[in-house]
Amino acid sequence: MLHSLFRLTLLFYALFNALGSLPVFIALLKNFSFKKQQHIILRESIFALLLLLLFVTFGRGFFRLLGIILPAFQFTGSLLLGSIAIDMMKALPPQTETLERDKDEPIFFPLAFPVITGPAMITSTLGHMEEGIFPKKIVLGAIVLAWLFSLITLLLSSSINRLFGQMGLLALERLFGISLALMAGNLMLKALSTAFNIGYYVTP
């Protein structure tokens, strides 16, 4: 159980991509005081968690009503994960030029969604809840733990940026990208195995 919790927490933390989002937060919040920055990060992180829990709690029934099946979640999730992984492995810097021009305080968009909780995160958590390999309490626990670690990362953004520097952050992001790419491949194999009933077993 602890091993499953660790694996899911690592996956969800990579999907929150707090390290990769640091430049966006720094650019958006640089005109605010340190205390105000911490307040905004905490508020937007709470918004992001509530949004994710809302999808996890009620999203499954809604998508079932639309006739969307588990392999669709898995396949779409693998594509989204793969896309994020490619960007992370290339260590593409976020587009912050437009953000830097905006002096207004960001509320919900774009920090809570889609920077912290994005489509890939929503799809992945829904997929894990739907497939039932992991107990729901493990999935929910992993979501909260990953969110907490991401929040700590964002709150320490200034210190982390000074400690690792731009090159260090890019190296860490590439490392997470490689792990995420492997997870995406595993998820796609699961989707194909389920959809075509080819009998290929992929460990959860």
Curated annotation (Swiss-Prot):
Bridged cysteine pairs (disulfide): none
Keywords: Cell membrane, Membrane, Transmembrane, Transmembrane helix
Domain of life, source organism: Bacteria
InterPro entries, A to Z: Multi_antbiot-R_MarC
Transmembrane segments: 9-29, 39-59, 66-86, 107-127, 138-158, 176-196
Topology relative to the membrane: Multi-pass membrane protein
A Pfam family reported for this protein in Swiss-Prot or TrEMBL: MarC
Subcellular location: Cell membrane
GO cellular component, as recorded: plasma membrane
Family the UniProt entry places it in: Belongs to the UPF0056 (MarC) family.
Protein name, UniProt field: UPF0056 membrane protein CT_852
Organism in which the protein naturally occurs: Chlamydia trachomatis serovar D (strain ATCC VR-885 / DSM 19411 / UW-3/Cx)
